[in-house]
């Protein structure tokens, strides 16, 4: 597994976990429209609250799978592709809301990292990392 791919994989995953846990109820300056938290942001997009929880749970699951992919490489590519697809949706929602690029730059960044991870990592024929490889990361 390429070091650049591993960095992209881990960075994308940690970024998503940060947004959906520590920054969930915070005004970040990157929220859609004038939203001050995640609930308001989904309202700006015209999406109901249950959609927010479904999207959040899926993104957290994909990000977690990407982290596990550091030890079980074969799950990296599907998780990375899934996260990249969700980021396309996030970018689309920002565009729909008329947000300037600055507000969806984080979504573009995570999309780029997840796509890079999907391209470089996750060869389905690659065996699981050995204990020595895991410890050397």
Predicted regions, residues:
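Short amphipathic, positively biased membrane-proximal segments
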Residues: 1-137
């Amino acid at each position: 597994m390429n070091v650049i791919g591993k960095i992209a994989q881990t960075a994308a995953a940690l970024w998503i976990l940060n947004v959906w846990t520590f920054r969930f109820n915070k005004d970040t300056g990157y929220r859609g429209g004038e939203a001050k938290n995640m609930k308001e942001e989904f309202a700006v997009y015209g999406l109901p609250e249950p959609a927010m929880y479904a999207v959040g749970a899926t993104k957290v699951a994909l990000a977690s799978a990407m982290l596990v992919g550091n030890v079980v490489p074969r799950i990296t590519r599907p998780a990375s592709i899934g996260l990249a697809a969700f980021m396309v949706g996030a970018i689309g929602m920002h565009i729909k809301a008329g947000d300037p690029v600055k507000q969806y730059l984080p979504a573009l960044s995570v999309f780029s990292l997840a796509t890079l991870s999907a391209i470089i990592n996750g060869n389905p024929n690659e065996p699981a990392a050995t204990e020595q490889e895991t410890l050397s990361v």
